[in-house]
Swiss-Prot record:
The lineage of its organism: Bacteria, Pseudomonadati, Thermodesulfobacteriota, Desulfuromonadia, Geobacterales. InterPro entries: Alpha/beta_knot_MTases, RlmH-like, tRNA_m1G_MTases_N. It holds the Pfam family SPOUT_MTase. This is Ribosomal RNA large subunit methyltransferase H. It comes from Trichlorobacter lovleyi (strain ATCC BAA-1151 / DSM 17278 / SZ). Specifically methylates the pseudouridine at position 1915 (m3Psi1915) in 23S rRNA.
Amino acid sequence: MKLRIIWLGKTRDPWIKQGVTEYSGRIERYLPLAIDELKDEKDATLEEGRRREGERLLKQLSPNAVLVALDERGQQLDSVKFAEFIGKHRDSGTTELVFAIGGSYGFSDEVRSRAGKVLALSAMTFTHQMVRPFLLEQIYRACTILNNEPYHH
């Protein structure tokens, strides 16, 4: 199974870039990983920005891709349940599992409809920039859980 992360907007902060690089490298020891940064909308109304970003995101998906949208209103899973979710897709023949992190406008209704699952990393709200290394760390943690390695206590 291939993992893919799609996010809107460039990663700006050096510490976020460092976290993305660190955890991407760790994940690639377990699963192939691709990260795509899509252009975000800067000068649009809320609805127009969501629509444009949503169209751009959906064009990136293959028909068989399983889309997981990260949203503060999504379902929360603990790390073990998140690992089980990834393992279920890995073991059931999912060819591509795509995690999408929206921009500051959030997701359009079309993206939400296409998503097989909507997840929240926390009940707290984080910037879409900060979610990037947090998601990658949780994916890495899931890989170690699935391989019975001691990273997760």
